[in-house]
């Protein structure tokens, strides 16, 4: 454990941030999984609705640095492509 006051404070901040980030990352994964689940069920309307919820979450967390911006772009691109493929079929 840290002995210096500022180091103790930083340790507390790390714990708080870690818990917050873990919860937010879980929320992100859940949102993406809902889109994938709708896609697997060939539910285009449900997938679009779930994607409308997931997209701003991806943008927000990439802006905050919770995930890399390229990872957010990759998720959005792949999910959009799958939604378009289901609508076309």
Swiss-Prot record:
Q: Name one GO molecular function term.
A: small ribosomal subunit rRNA binding
Keyword Cell membrane (UniProt): no
Q: Where is the composition biased (Basic residues)?
A: 1-12
Q: Where is this region: Disordered?
A: 1-22
**Any Pfam family hit:** Ribosomal_S20p
What Gene3D superfamilies is this protein classified in? Ribosomal protein S20
Role: Binds directly to 16S ribosomal RNA.
Family annotation (HAMAP family): Ribosomal_bS20
What is the recorded name of this protein? Small ribosomal subunit protein bS20
Q: What is the lineage of its organism?
A: Bacteria, Pseudomonadati, Pseudomonadota, Gammaproteobacteria, Lysobacterales
Q: Coding gene?
A: rpsT
């Amino acid at each position: 454990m840290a002995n210096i006051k500022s180091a103790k404070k930083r340790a507390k901040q790390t714990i708080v941030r870690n818990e917050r980030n873990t919860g937010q990352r879980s929320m992100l994964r859940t949102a993406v999984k809902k889109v994938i689940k709708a896609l697997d069920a060939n539910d285009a309307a449900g997938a679009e609705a779930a994607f409308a919820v997931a997209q701003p979450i991806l943008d927000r967390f990439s802006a905050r640095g919770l995930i890399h911006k390229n990872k957010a772009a990759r998720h959005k691109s792949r999910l959009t492509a799958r939604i378009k493929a289901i609508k076309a079929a």
